[in-house]
């Protein structure tokens, strides 16, 4: 799949995940603010957050049993792995595995 199409698909899935998180759990204000700062480029926002090892959101999702909504869970999906450096995919895999996420 063409990389720009893949990025758009990832962005759309991130937006849907955020909507569901807002509805069911909490408002990820920092992430939403960063999306605006990066012109809705979720790939770049994620690279920044994962590189900083931000864990607040994933911890809240873990507490509610909703790790499948995490950005980390999106990143490790086979179709999106090529959008990210292997180091970021590995960090996300380790975080999720540590929390017992079964889709790895």
What are these model-derived regions, one by one?
Residues 17-66:
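Amphipathic alpha-helical packing elements
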Residues 2-23, 97-98:
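Charged, compositionally biased N-terminal leader segments and the immediate start
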Residues 63-104:
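Amphipathic alpha-helical binding modules
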Residues 9-13, 31, 40, 48-55, ...:
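Intrinsically disordered, charged low-complexity linkers and terminal tails
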């Amino acid at each position: 799949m063409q990389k720009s199409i893949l990025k758009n698909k990832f962005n759309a899935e991130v937006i849907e995940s955020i909507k569901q998180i807002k509805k069911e759990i909490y408002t990820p204000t920092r992430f939403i603010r960063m999306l605006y700062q990066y012109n809705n480029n979720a790939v770049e926002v994620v690279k920044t957050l994962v590189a900083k090892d931000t864990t607040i959101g994933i911890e809240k999702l873990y507490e509610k049993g909703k790790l499948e909504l995490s950005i980390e869970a999106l990143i490790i999906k086979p179709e999106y792995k090529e959008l990210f450096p292997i180091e970021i995919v590995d960090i996300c895999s380790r975080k999720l595995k540590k929390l017992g996420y079964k889709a790895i």
